[in-house]
Structure formats: structure tokens, C-alpha cells
Regions:
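N-terminal structural segment of carbohydrate-active enzymes
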Residues: 1-162
Length: 162
């Protein structure tokens, strides 16, 4: 497992609100290095007792491989947190090895009840959600390639453009 290939940041294009209820979360890994990724997630303030011990309540969901650019693979998932906030970390599976990837880095073996190596999305703020203006639906977009309008070498009969 290429540990240097793992990257996530709680913000920007890696974790953001799609709408008032949904978070979109992405993880970047080295290309063709990881077999699967699961997201361990839950509300940061939901705790319960298991075997007489207070533990953070969390769920595990598989992420989907969204694409690759030949250097990195990109994994993603959409989550609907019940209270618009989320604590989460990743379970990364590769070559029979499973590691936990969180804010503090990579940990092996993973601790299912981990509360110290997590990412936290504090709250889905309506002001942070992108809303396209109404006029954009009626817009016609053009791509202009200026180099295709003038060929200074036209007399030579070549197809060369500037």
C-alpha cells in the first residue's frame, strides 16, 4: 500500500455540501493501489454502550471508485447526516491489509471505536452551498480558438497554424 498516495482534507473539493442535507466526500489514493475503501461515519455527539463501554456510534458504508487520472484514483460517497454534522474516517483495504486513515494519518490495525483520528465536518451551512444563477440555464457557451482564424503560412500550402 502506497501510504504517501493517500490524501483527504475536510473541506474544499474533498468534503463539501451538495445541498441542505447531503455531504459529498472524496479520498485520493495512488492509482491501482487500493482494493476498496469504506467510510466509517456518524454524528460526533452520539454515544452508546457496547459491552459496558461508552463508544461512539458509527456506521460503515463502502465508497465507490469515481475515476482515475493514471496517477491517482478518486473514491467518493454521498452521506446524509441526520443532524447536518459528521465525524468520519476511512477504512482502506489493499493486498489483504486494512488500515484506518484519518486526520492524524494512517493507523494499522484499525480501531473500530476510534475517536481521536477522525475528520469532522462541523455543520452544513446554507451559505456554503452553491446555487447556480437562474440565467445560466439559458446561456449558450462557446469555445473560441484564435489560432484557427489566421494562417500566416497559407501561401506555402501547409496546414500549420500559429
Amino acid at each position: 500500500m502506497n501510504k504517501a498516495g493517500l490524501y483527504h482534507h475536510c473541506g474544499d473539493q474533498w468534503c463539501y455540501a451538495l445541498d441542505n442535507d447531503t455531504l459529498h466526500i472524496r479520498l485520493k489514493t495512488a492509482a491501482d493501489d487500493i482494493d476498496s475503501v469504506d467510510l466509517v461515519h456518524g454524528d460526533p455527539f452520539e454515544w452508546g454502550k457496547i459491552d459496558g463501554k461508552q463508544v461512539w456510534r458509527s456506521n460503515i458504508q463502502p465508497m465507490t471508485k469515481a475515476g482515475t487520472n493514471g496517477v491517482h484514483d478518486f473514491w467518493e460517497i454521498r452521506i446524509t447526516p441526520p443532524y447536518k454534522r459528521l465525524k468520519y474516517w476511512f477504512l482502506v483495504h489493499a493486498n489483504g491489509e486494512t488500515c484506518e486513515f484519518g486526520e492524524k494519518g494512517l493507523v494499522s490495525p484499525p480501531d473500530r471505536w476510534n475517536t481521536w483520528n477522525t475528520f469532522i465536518f462541523p455543520y452544513i451551512q446554507p451559505a456554503e452551498i452553491f446555487h447556480a444563477p437562474e440565467w445560466i440555464a439559458d446561456t449558450v457557451w462557446y469555445q473560441i480558438f484564435p489560432e484557427r482564424y489566421h494562417n500566416p503560412d497559407a501561401a506555402s500550402g501547409t496546414e500549420k497554424n500559429t
